[in-house]
Amino acid sequence: MCIIFFKFDPRPVSKNAYRLILAANRDEFYNRPSKLADFWGNNSEILSGLDMEEGKAGGTWLGISTRGKLGALTNYLQPRQEPDARGRGELVSHFLTSDMDSLSYLKKVSTEGHLYNGFNIIAADLSTSKGDVVCYYGNRGEPEPIVLTPGTYGLSNALLETPWKKLCFGKQLFMEAVEQSEALPKDVLVTQLLDVLNNEEAQLPDPAIEDQGQEYVQPILNKYAAVCVRCATYGTRTNTIILVDANGHVTFTERSMLDKDTSRWETNTYEFTLQS
């Protein structure tokens, strides 16, 4: 289970406004090996965490490059996983390293969607000179990817904007923080967005999540019903905030759990300016 909230406006009216504000949680088993976010790839142009699970190493759930490519992934809640399916994390890694634009890449992915367990992917080209393009594809939804219109979106483990209660609740909190963003110091905005991502209020009952996950036992589904998931061996282990301002300056903040210990966290922030 993961969750992403984002707002994008390629041409903000105010010079103090952000072109992109993104807040995301990675939910995963605490013992799944991964690397904290850092730069990698040709000329160290890509910034992301990396999955280090055997057979899936090198994939990622969220990343951005200095060239302005951004990718984000969530899994689709389904009871039965195909054990021989390809690793979904490669979808983001391949986009970040490719020369394809976001829509062309997702069109290619859509022809191969059947090779993977359920997923959603956001792919974006962020360009200060040409304008920003953000696209979406889910292999359990429409057969073709779509180009998103500027606005505010929520994505969890169903299709984009599926009204799970926790998604609607978290999106409202996200929008309240975003509405103040121009007046807030950047560090205060990041703190408020991290507060949104760490909200553990279960949004129950939720017929939508129960219907999609009907083969799961109820206590498990109930654990998934908050923005921040907290179980004994599984849950939210990474918070990420990405801000892109009107001039293409990127602030990437990652807060990650250390050593499978829910009381120990490390926060790192990276900043750079888009090359495009």
Swiss-Prot record:
Keywords (A to Z) from UniProt: Cytoplasm, Golgi apparatus, Mitochondrion
Keyword match Transport: no
Domain of life: Eukaryota
Disulfide-bond pairs as recorded: none
Subcellular location: Cytoplasm; Mitochondrion; Golgi apparatus
Record's protein name: Transport and Golgi organization 2 homolog
Gene name of the record: Tango2
GO cellular component, one term: cytosol
Parts forming coiled coils: none
Xref: Pfam families: TANGO2
Tissue: Expressed in fetal liver, lung, heart and kidney. In brain, detected in the olfactory bulb, neocortex and cerebellum. Elevated in mitral cells and minimally expressed in bulb interneurons. In the cortex, restricted to the upper portion of layer 5. In the cerebellum, excluded from Purkinje cells but expressed in granule cells.
Family to which this protein belongs: Belongs to the Tango2 family.
Free-text function comment from the UniProt entry: May be involved in lipid homeostasis.
